[in-house]
From Swiss-Prot:
HAMAP family: CinA_B
Family listed: Belongs to the CinA family.
Top-level taxon of the source organism: Bacteria
Protein name: CinA-like protein
SMART domains per the UniProt record, alphabetical: MoCF_biosynth
Record NCBIfam families: cinA_nterm, PncC_domain, PRK00549.1
Organism of derivation: Gloeobacter violaceus (strain ATCC 29082 / PCC 7421)
InterPro entries xrefs: CinA, CinA-like_C, CinA_C, CinA_KH, Competence-induced_CinA, MoaB/Mog-like_dom_sf, MoaB/Mog_dom
Amino acid sequence: MAPSAEILCIGTELLLGQIVNTNAQFLAVELAKLGIPHHFQTVVGDNPGRIRLALDIAIERAGIILTTGGLGPTDDDLTHQTLAEHFEVPLVRHPALLALIEERFRERNRPMSPTNAKQADLPEGAQILPNPMGTAPGIVWEPKAGVAILTFPGVPAEMRAMWAETAVPFLRLRGGGQEIFHSRTLRHWGVSESTLAEKVEEFLRGVNPTVAPYAGNGEVKLRITARAAGIAAAESLIAPVEASLRTIAGLDCYGADEDTLASASAALLVRTGTTLAVAESCTGGMLAEALTALPGASRYLRGAVVAYANDLKTSLLGVDEQRMIDHGAVSEPVARAMAEGVRNRLASDWGLALTGVSGPGGGTAQKPVGLVHIALAGPGETRAVEIRLGAQRGRDWIRRVSTQSALDLLRREIINWEAFGIMKER
């Protein structure tokens, strides 16, 4: 059986919540790919005593310890110094490593501070874990029988490069797991976690593969995880479960893994050879940004209009002024007029529009913060939906979820139009 691993992330900024700990997430996924079990993650500040305490605990329960952070040149970068003190060995300066660090500074035409020299000081007996992107090398060290320590800088890009080039080969040679864990994540929109869990309850009791639901930012994910001798074997276990789950979810499932509602909608536009124009008010360009962030957006996106002011809704989109007086700018009739106007004026097949109250101010009893109207004009009738998101989660969340909801409306209607030649009611 492969030794288990523990992830030890060092940095006071992590404890204070100033930086999101993406390194731990990355390492957890990579360990699973290698079939190396890991049961604990620890975050500790830049304090030698507490780092040593965390090491003591980790050594008792794991044979592989992966640390991130604390490899820089400043006084609070203490990882290698603390490791050396903990195992009672001296720090040894590596002249070749120091020369490499100096060369990095010359390449960047920057002066090297004397404090950077300490990055060439490593615990005696440790092997250098090269950093192809920065000046902070890590180490691969087996300070005692049954314990391997690998250190990485806290900068995610540097840590990932070092992981792929040096750490993975070392861990594979060390034995890796006889089995690997492989996952597929199905992504859903327009359904609650509890409702989806009820529909797939039978699969949640599975053992291999397992199925686990989790929700966030308006969407629900189903993670299917298989344990097998290799990726191909794991895929063969996942495939039939994935097919069944997709059938049960129907249109609520929009993709898997790295798919987004924007990419799913874009793929449908490309497949159907149709074009899109968008008109935004409350989202302020977020919908257009989601679409243009994808390569090849010019194939399907005609353009976008951000019309915040009411007079611009009239002059740019052709929304009748009296309609806004009668119904208000945040209303279904205005959303419909915006969608139809942008479709006509930008000569696109589809026109998608949003208008709403993002907050924190501007809401009323009749039109509270979080009220958003979305409309889609297309080859058939114009469709409109109203969503109420509440004010509790804040302006940015309302704008992001509104954007995703608009893309979901577009996705569903294109699928219906492609299948039936008409736009169907949801």
